[in-house]
Regions:
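Mobile cofactor-carrier "swinging-arm" domains
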Residues: 25, 48-58, 107, 126-150
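A residue-level signal for beta-strand positions that form part of recognition/binding surfaces
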Residues: 49, 122, 158
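A structural micro-motif recognizing beta-strand termini
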Residues: 11, 19-24, 37-38, 54-56, ...
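P-loop NTPase nucleotide-binding/switch module
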Residues: 63-99, 103-106, 113-118, 135-184
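N-terminal accessory targeting/assembly segments
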Residues: 1-62, 66-69
């Protein structure tokens, strides 16, 4: 059958109540569910400012037809496009989650490539690539934790949509309305 994306609302015994994000036609009470082990999350990285997404971050330009097919999903970022990565840190630097490792440019907008948000503590930059073109899946840095474990870092981050980000030094308040001309 189709694999439908849903979010667990509550669990009672062996029963799970879910919110399904598309048509539930054909589903029955008692149908089996597969748990991915992940919360509903967004994929962050270079290329997302150039895409047209639906509410589940499907790339609408890759999907055929006027209506989305049930159970059809696309990866939200282009895994083959190369981005000009410019390192900001150097080997030996100490970094923390959300620290800037380097940057790429998308539509004349600099995008920071950061230490993964979900990490905790301080890390040493073991290596960082030279300025050059890389895909979002290429390893651009290797970090070492306090126990000596190496953590490869690429340009992709996943973040649960219902979890607030807390790894920031300052959270500026908006001071100007962003007018898009689009009615929401």
């Amino acid at each position: 059958g189709d694999r439908l994306m849903a979010e667990v609302i509550k669990v009672v015994g062996k029963n799970v109540y879910v919110q399904v994000f598309e048509s539930t036609r054909g589903l029955k009470v008692g149908a089996e569910a597969e748990f991915t082990g992940h919360m509903l999350e967004v994929t962050l990285g270079p290329g997302m400012l150039s895409k047209n997404y639906d509410g589940l971050q499907n790339d609408l330009d890759k999907m055929e037809g006027v209506f989305l097919k049930r159970g059809q999903y696309t990866y939200p970022l282009d895994k083959e496009k190369k981005w000009l990565f410019k390192p900001i840190v150097k080997a030996g630097d100490e970094v923390e989650p959300s620290a800037w490792l380097g940057e790429v440019e998308e539509n004349h907008q600099p995008l920071k490539i950061m230490v993964p948000f979900q990490l905790q503590g301080t890390y040493k930059v073991k290596s960082i690539v030279e300025e050059g073109e890389y895909t979002i899946e290429d390893t651009v840095a290797v970090l070492t934790d306090a126990e000596g474990n190496d953590i490869p870092v690429n340009m992709i981050q996943k973040w649960p949509v219902k979890k607030a980000m807390t790894n920031y030094k300052e959270k500026p308040r908006p001071y100007k309305l962003l007018e898009t001309g689009v009615r929401v």
